[in-house]
Amino acid sequence: MKVVHVVRQFHPSIGGMEEVVLNVARQHQANSADTVEIVTLDRVFTDPSAQLAQHELHQGLSITRIGYRGSSRYPIAPSVLGAIRSADVVHLHGIDFFYDYLALTKPLHGKPMVVSTHGGFFHTAYASRMKQIWFQTLTRTSALAYARVIATSENDGDLFAKVVAPSRLRVIENGVDVEKYAGQGARAPGRTMLYFGRWSVNKGLIETLELLQAALTRDPQWRLIIAGREYDLNEADLRKAIAERGLQDKVQLSMSPSQQQLCALMQQAQFFVCLSRHEGFGIAAVEAMSAGLIPILSDIPPFVRLATESGQGVIVNRDRIQAAADSVQALALQANADFDARRTATMAYVARYDWRHVVGRYIDEYHAALGTPRTQEAVR
């Protein structure tokens, strides 16, 4: 069986969706006799002037890149039809042009397809009314072309249940590479919060600065590290926001750190903070917990579930910063007494997200789309 993953951004782009595709494809190929390939766009959205190689091998995976026109919100790339010609099954990632176009052209290409939702297109409030109309019409219609719609979180499952029949909807929560940062967090209690991920308004970074400002009135030892890559906030934007709040001595910025550099930053921190407005799943939070970082998270459904099930960390309302700072300070005081136990429990909880436990469910869906039984040895 040959599975071709179609995703708008992949290596060298870094992000949650890219990480999911890499791990599904890598685990599948490493543990079966199947062939797995990636089809993606030939430019990274954050550096559109640099055209990438048409073909590349990355971590043993064959990548084919195709050109596009239009915006990063809805990049138009009809040449995807040629790129999937050799596939037995096509696995789409995200609800975007590829999703709509491959559904529309299914009578031409005839490929069995599954799609993973990755939060749909509701990550920001941008054009929210138009998005709802699109979702209820075009997204609903396009879904009919897919053998399975795979919701990547319970939150997505609830959302897509509005437009997809229950018989064709499955929830398969993302796995996470829990070995990558395992145990890298600080081993002694302290007052350092770490955020890592995209520098985006959606991620609540300005509110995170306000939380730090409020926390400092309760304990002057608090520090914040913001690591990641520029998105709709750049380094100048963040430095300006930091200076406006007088936090220059309390915030460290690390732009585009390597994995090794991020591990070094984790070793300085006790807490992971993310005040996102929306997450399909929240991979970074799980990665942080695998490092032993205690989570400080916004009150969105995937984060509430993570904190509730793990029994670790604290959920805060980013619109009530003073109350949030009280909760964070109380958490830190409690952690002074039992930090090692909290750290250990946090790491133990996320072991369930290991990709080894997840990839078999995807392979089951590929076989279901093909109408072929899966043999016991499909995953070793």
From Swiss-Prot:
GO molecular function: glycosyltransferase activity
Domain of life of the native organism: Bacteria
Pfam families found in the cross-reference section: Glyco_transf_4, Glycos_transf_1
This enzyme's EC code(s): 2.4.1.252
Catalytic activity: beta-D-Glc-(1->4)-alpha-D-Glc-di-trans,octa-cis-undecaprenyl diphosphate + GDP-alpha-D-mannose = alpha-D-Man-(1->3)-beta-D-Glc-(1->4)-alpha-D-Glc-1-di-trans,octa-cis-undecaprenyl diphosphate + GDP + H(+)
BP-aspect Gene Ontology terms: polysaccharide biosynthetic process
The keyword Phosphoprotein appears for this protein: no
Keyword rRNA processing belongs to the record: no
Enzyme category, top tier: transferase
Keyword line: Exopolysaccharide synthesis, Glycosyltransferase, Transferase, Virulence
Function according to Swiss-Prot or TrEMBL: Involved in the biosynthesis of the exopolysaccharide xanthan, a polymer that is comprised of repeating pentasaccharide units with the structure of a beta-(1,4)-linked D-glucose backbone with trisaccharide side chains composed of mannose-beta-(1,4)-glucuronic acid-beta-(1,2)-mannose attached to alternate glucose residues in the backbone by alpha-(1,3) linkages.
Family: Belongs to the glycosyltransferase group 1 family. Glycosyltransferase 4 subfamily.
The protein, known as: GDP-mannose:cellobiosyl-diphosphopolyprenol alpha-mannosyltransferase
